[in-house]
Amino acid sequence: MGMPDRESLGGPVACEPPFVAELRRLGVEVAEETYVYGGKLSRTPLRQRVVRVLATARRFSRLLREAEFDILHLNSSFDTMALLRDAATIQLLRPTRARIFVKFHGSDAALFETNRAELRSLVRFVLARVDGIGLLSAEERENFRRAGVEGQKLFVVKNVVSAGADEKSALQVQQSANLLRAKLGVDAEETPLLLFIARFIPAKGLTDVLDACAILRDEGRAFRLLCLGDGAARAAAEAQAARLQLAEQVRFFGYVPEAETGEFYTGSTILVFPTYHYEGFPMVIFKSVAAGLPIITTRIRAAADYLREPDHCLWVEPRNPQMLAEKITQLLDQTEARAAMRRHNLELARQFTARVVAPEYLEIYNQLAKT
């Protein structure tokens, strides 16, 4: 299995290790190889990228020669850089008896409509040479189907989401919130904590969140916004917060390791995540589901497949700070609605445990192995 580097950022590093652990518990022999192209926060030189891809392909080839593996599972993304890596890897591996299954952690549908002939050829090459494609939402499956990909190759799959606050009582959740407030120096117990956690790129919607916070502040609403993450848009976001005079309301934490984010999910009041990125299964949303955290987000891909308003979330339009501010106000003013969201989200989270998700993949693997 091609795995993310354990030091990398994003969803795969959170969901794939517990998935592999469950496969092994079920008796499946799994060999892991790091399968990355470059870094998230810093640019990796082209030469280093090429060397890394070639070395990874050689390791895969050796493993497939030395043992009779049935499936090669690659964790990837349907974007230009990842497809370049995938094409090189697949070409260097052929021929192989193992069936190749690629799980796309997000997909850029614009690649199907590109005018660049070399990109169209790259897309056709990869999609023609894999045996199965894992997509994280029904929308993505429909995009691939409309682009002419054979339906029998397409599978809608889930990410594993580690258990959150399902065994915590309401009192324990309040205690978590109080501990987080104490750590942050927020004295007032009634001050709500809004959470934004993501890689800082414009499409994640942080600009809209900050504009919405300025509206809330001007309306006299007390709150704190906790911004966890790093990336290319961080400097612009910090400058925007300063320009809007939000120093008292907004705190930037920078990158927080996955293992240290739990207290923010369980201690915050609402996740505010108006993303319009092409991610398939936003782990921030589903980690919030697992923590029983009320959610305000956009109706995007896997979120649209599994979440329902008002049971699990409130929907907001992308690039609409006024609407976002109104939804935040609505949810903050409805204590019972937040409590109901917590219950419903904890129930929904059971669908994404490793013990539920791993057997679903085994069915796909068995189907591919028989073809």
Placement of each model-derived feature along the sequence:
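Conserved donor-binding/catalytic core segment of Leloir-type glycosyltransferases
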Residues: 161, 176-204, 210-213, 226
